[in-house]
Amino acid sequence: EHQIFTRRADFPNLKNYIGKSLVVTDGLTLLGGDDKAGICEIMEALAYLVAHPEIKHGKIMCAFGPDEEIGTGADHFDVKQFPVDYAYTIDGESLGQLEYETFNAAGGTVTLKGVSVHTGTAKGIMINCAKLAMQFDALLPGAAVPEHTCGRQGFFMLMSMETQVDTGKMNYIIRDHDKELFEAKKAFFLQAGQTLNDIYGREVCEVSVKDQYYNMYDVIKDNMECVNVAKAAMEKAGITPLCDPIRGGTDGSKISFMGIPTPNIFTGVENL
């Protein structure tokens, strides 16, 4: 109907599902199975346990939180109301994924301050914020962007930009798995602002950085029981655990630093 196709050339993982039934969306929304699949799986698991009391288990607690996709899902999570030894977010992707390494993450804001005058008398006076934005972005390493990095390589990403001649604002995200490299990237970002100010001999930009979440591995590495239990459960079900670092984060990143080690488990979705 909408001529939207998921092609194997673009998503090679599709070959793993030949002959299997797929649940798909219409392709018109930002999110597909993320994280509708996780909610369904949690509720189905609870329903199954209720229907089969012969299955012995300890105390199980579940929580559902909004706003994970904008990085604030765990901001008001009350760990006192969730007395567990460890937890799992059900927010992963393909079969077998078990993730306990995330990015360290920060947001960067650049406020631009230009000078607007009539174009006829602009020589030596006008400072165009659109040009400032391009200059600032050019000061960041061109290869350290999402489209040129993979694995544990971090990046800067310009998320949005709005400029007029005399005002402007740029919003970035800054990511790295390694804490030292993360701190170095934040310092580099702030220095880029100072460099631009030095070029113009005046304050043409104001730069700020705010941490968003940290690599859960720094907590989980000393609490590996949650990972080992999940691995054993998958292997018992004939599933091979796939433990790769997440090039992103989950609510489990923040919850882990609140005192509850919380790795992430697959939901079975592809092309979120």
Q: What are these language model-derived features?
A:
Residues 164, 241-272:
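Zn-dependent metallopeptidase/amidohydrolase metal-coordination segment
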Residues 2-33, 66-194, 203-205, 210-216:
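Midchain, well-structured core segments that form catalytic/ion-binding scaffolds
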Residues 205-209, 238-245:
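C-terminal helix-coil-helix/basic helical segment that borders enzyme active sites and/or dimer interfaces
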Residues 46-53, 137-145, 193-201, 234-238:
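Structural signal for hydrophobic packing residues in well-ordered secondary-structure cores
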Residues 47-69, 150-151:
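Short helix-loop-beta-strand segments that form the rim/entrance of peptidase-like active sites
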Residues 39-47, 78, 85, 130-138, ...:
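Predominant activation on well-ordered alpha-helical scaffold segments within soluble catalytic domains
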Residues 215-233:
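Short, low-order "capping/linker" segments at domain edges
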